[in-house]
Design a protein with these regions (language model features):
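N-terminal lobe of the biotin/lipoate ligase/transferase fold
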Residues: 2-157
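Conserved small/polar residues in nucleotide/adenosyl-binding loops
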Residues: 161-163
């Protein structure tokens, strides 16, 4: 619910009433208040005005699960997001999750990797605060010989977004 509240606050032109949030999610005002407070504790500046509702004033410069989910507008990619401050390797974690049956499109993100791996098993230095370290778990219906091309296609797609 936090991610959805954050998404609504981001897209709103003004205030969103607490009652509107209650109705939308089928929860009590207390549940909405708790979710808003959790967002505030995470660094979001949310203004609350009596008889008006809530308004997002500023977002922290942080990468969190709620932040990532609130910015994703997709049918399958990152519907499931797992965020870690520190992890051995996002790739190893994604492999573990795949074995547990997590769906295609699961995104594993970390601020720091202690044993990050790059292409061909090379060591990937990934200290805190220096990048976005992630593994997108996909189960494509392609020939395994073509799987190595997916990294190139993803990099190209991301570069085109910033042009």
């Amino acid at each position: 619910m936090k991610e959805e509240i954050l998404r609504l606050l981001r897209s709103a032109d003004g205030y969103i009433s607490g009652q509107e949030l209650c109705n939308r999610f089928g929860v009590s005002r207390t549940a909405v208040w708790k979710a808003i407070n959790q967002l505030k504790e995470a660094g979001y500046e949310i203004e609350a005005q009596q008889n008006k509702g809530y308004r997002l004033m500023a977002a922290p410069d942080l990468m969190t699960e709620a932040e990532i989910k609130s910015l994703m507008h997709t049918d399958w990619v990152a519907k499931e997001v797992l965020y870690f401050d520190t992890i051995d390797s996002t790739n190893i974690k994604a492999q573990e999750l795949a074995e547990k049956g997590y769906p295609s499109g699961t995104l594993v993100v970390a601020d720091k990797q202690e044993s990050g791996k790059g292409r061909r098993g090379r060591s990937w230095v990934s200290p805190s605060g220096t990048g976005i370290f992630m593994t997108l778990m996909i189960k494509p219906d392609i020939n395994p010989n073509n799987a190595s091309m997916l990294t190139l296609v993803a990099a190209l797609a991301l570069s085109l977004i910033h042009i």
